[in-house]
Amino acid sequence: MHFFHLYERYKHRINQKLFYTLNQLPFQKSSLLKAMKYSVFSGSKRLRSSLIYSTGDVFKVNITTLDVISTAIEFIHSYSLIHDDLPCMDNDNFRRGKISCHVKYGESTSLLAGDALQSLAFNILSNSFMPNVSNLKRIKMISELSYSIGSSGMCMGQNLDLEAEKKDVNLSELEIINLYKTSFLMRSAVRLVYFSSNNFSKSILSILDLFSISIGLAFQIQDDILDFKKDSVKTDNKKIIKKHTYPLIIGLDESRKKIKQLHKKSFLALNSLKKKISIPTY
């Protein structure tokens, strides 16, 4: 099957799981639930879920387990975007062509919606049925995710990003910001699948880390390019000056070259993985 069709299948599947999970919660008519749903279904590409299901195919992880992991990761991702957009953070009024959660539902409700999605993610990972996943594996998965989004991961990335607004930043510093802010959640998504499998090898884990981090950074640069193009046509470019991005620091052409380099890294990682295990061909 062509990967595009597989991607669409994965995207449809996780959207159904997210919809079902949120609809099972109490207080469906509350502004909190409405804000949570609004943010989760605001046009996400579900890239992290696609990586989860694809990695699960490689390591023969039960689809039910992959559903649990994908749901948890997508809720974490949505929570992070809600908080990123808040006036005290990036102060963005739009997200994926729609008004941000805090503009539609207010800051206090948006803050709570992000908090609720984060706690829901861990509740799902803690309590949902995952075939052949022992309690020891489950604890390892929870530990991995909590580490990757806290002060040693995503939250630190956001903090570094906020601090960077006050000074000049070089390419190396920008890569560190995006490593923590974006790539660590991507890495965690792939790691959770591997930790839930019946395999474990430090060498394979290192390959998976290289692959997922490279994909995460490439995705961030592409996002920066798209934002740069959109913001460049606007008369008010204060945000462009305020935020440090790849196009601003190294230019559009070098940013595109950087994406190609990262794609090459990710493919080399997959080739290394092929030498150790059998990988499905799409």
Curated annotation (Swiss-Prot):
<feature type="binding site">
    <location>
        <position position="84"/>
    </location>
    <ligand>
        <name>Mg(2+) 2</name>
    </ligand>
</feature>
<feature type="binding site">
    <location>
        <position position="45"/>
    </location>
    <ligand>
        <name>isopentenyl diphosphate</name>
    </ligand>
</feature>
<dbReference type="InterPro" id="IPR000092">
    <property type="entry name" value="Polyprenyl_synt"/>
</dbReference>
<keyword id="KW-0479">Metal-binding</keyword>
<feature type="binding site">
    <location>
        <position position="182"/>
    </location>
    <ligand>
        <name>(2E)-geranyl diphosphate</name>
    </ligand>
</feature>
<feature type="binding site">
    <location>
        <position position="77"/>
    </location>
    <ligand>
        <name>isopentenyl diphosphate</name>
    </ligand>
</feature>
<protein>
    <recommendedName>
        <fullName>Farnesyl diphosphate synthase</fullName>
        <ecNumber>2.5.1.10</ecNumber>
    </recommendedName>
</protein>
<dbReference type="GO" id="GO:0008299">
    <property type="term" value="P:isoprenoid biosynthetic process"/>
</dbReference>
<feature type="binding site">
    <location>
        <position position="90"/>
    </location>
    <ligand>
        <name>Mg(2+) 1</name>
    </ligand>
</feature>
<comment type="similarity">
    <text>Belongs to the FPP/GGPP synthase family.</text>
</comment>
<dbReference type="Pfam" id="PF00348">
    <property type="entry name" value="polyprenyl_synt"/>
</dbReference>
<feature type="binding site">
    <location>
        <position position="96"/>
    </location>
    <ligand>
        <name>isopentenyl diphosphate</name>
    </ligand>
</feature>
<feature type="binding site">
    <location>
        <position position="90"/>
    </location>
    <ligand>
        <name>Mg(2+) 2</name>
    </ligand>
</feature>
<dbReference type="InterPro" id="IPR033749">
    <property type="entry name" value="Polyprenyl_synt_CS"/>
</dbReference>
<feature type="binding site">
    <location>
        <position position="220"/>
    </location>
    <ligand>
        <name>(2E)-geranyl diphosphate</name>
    </ligand>
</feature>
<dbReference type="InterPro" id="IPR008949">
    <property type="entry name" value="Isoprenoid_synthase_dom_sf"/>
</dbReference>
<dbReference type="GO" id="GO:0046872">
    <property type="term" value="F:metal ion binding"/>
</dbReference>
<feature type="binding site">
    <location>
        <position position="95"/>
    </location>
    <ligand>
        <name>(2E)-geranyl diphosphate</name>
    </ligand>
</feature>
<dbReference type="GO" id="GO:0005737">
    <property type="term" value="C:cytoplasm"/>
</dbReference>
<keyword id="KW-0414">Isoprene biosynthesis</keyword>
<feature type="binding site">
    <location>
        <position position="84"/>
    </location>
    <ligand>
        <name>Mg(2+) 1</name>
    </ligand>
</feature>
<feature type="binding site">
    <location>
        <position position="48"/>
    </location>
    <ligand>
        <name>isopentenyl diphosphate</name>
    </ligand>
</feature>
<keyword id="KW-0460">Magnesium</keyword>
<keyword id="KW-0963">Cytoplasm</keyword>
<feature type="binding site">
    <location>
        <position position="181"/>
    </location>
    <ligand>
        <name>(2E)-geranyl diphosphate</name>
    </ligand>
</feature>
<dbReference type="GO" id="GO:0004337">
    <property type="term" value="F:(2E,6E)-farnesyl diphosphate synthase activity"/>
</dbReference>
<keyword id="KW-0808">Transferase</keyword>
